[in-house]
Curated annotation (Swiss-Prot):
It comes from the Viruses. Interacts with the major capsid protein. One of the minor capsid proteins that constitute a network internal to the major capsid proteins and outside the lipid membrane. The minor capsid proteins glue and stabilize the capsomers. Induction: Expressed in the late phase of the viral replicative cycle. Its main location: virion. This is Minor capsid protein 3. The keyword Ribosomal protein does not apply. It comes from Paramecium bursaria Chlorella virus 1 (PBCV-1). Keywords: Capsid protein, Late protein, Virion.
């Protein structure tokens, strides 16, 4: 008799359809955002990184190489499926002479630090943004992250001091 009851429970469990699992209605579920985080955000981040590096004077090939490295490091930190890092800033330190120093400090850059200051900070991320301690986080999309100045402006003022400004625009 006990064997028959167990068999009935298994049959009932197999009849549960995936559509009956309320993933969208569950505010703590991350499945609806899986595609957005793992596909859309890295693609846009890579394009913006390459665009910014080209504007700084790198060749297209060099910009593509640096853009790949930077975006792979940061997006891997943002993906829960790949574990994330302990600290994104130390992971990205020294990735390139343009991105390694921080606070808008650049080597041999004739135009301005403003472009670098914008998209470097958005690529690096932060401890809060990658949700290291909170296990049931509400995931973000690329639109919710600070938009780099590379995507917001087309002209830059040479010699403008950006260290006292926000990295992603003025309110």
């Amino acid at each position: 008799m006990a064997m028959k009851t167990q068999r009935k429970e298994n049959v009932l469990f197999q009849n549960v359809k995936p559509r009956e699992i309320p993933l969208v209605d569950n505010p703590f579920s991350t499945y609806p955002y899986k595609h957005v985080i793992t596909e859309t955000q890295p693609t846009q981040a890579k394009n913006q990184a390459i665009w910014g590096l080209v504007q700084m004077g790198l060749s297209g090939e060099a910009a593509a190489m640096y853009g790949d490295v930077v975006v792979q490091k940061t997006t891997r930190a943002c993906r829960k499926s790949e574990g994330g890092f302990k600290d994104v800033n130390t992971e990205l330190w020294g990735t390139s002479p343009y991105l390694g120093r921080g606070d808008g400090e650049v080597y041999n850059m004739p135009a301005s630090n403003q472009l670098l200051r914008g998209f470097e900070s958005s690529l690096r991320g932060s401890r809060v943004r990658t949700q290291i301690d909170d296990k049931s986080f509400i995931p973000y999309t690329w639109q919710m992250i600070d938009v780099p100045l590379a995507a917001a402006k087309t002209s830059f003022i040479a010699g403008l001091d950006t260290r006292q400004q926000l990295a992603y625009g003025n309110p």
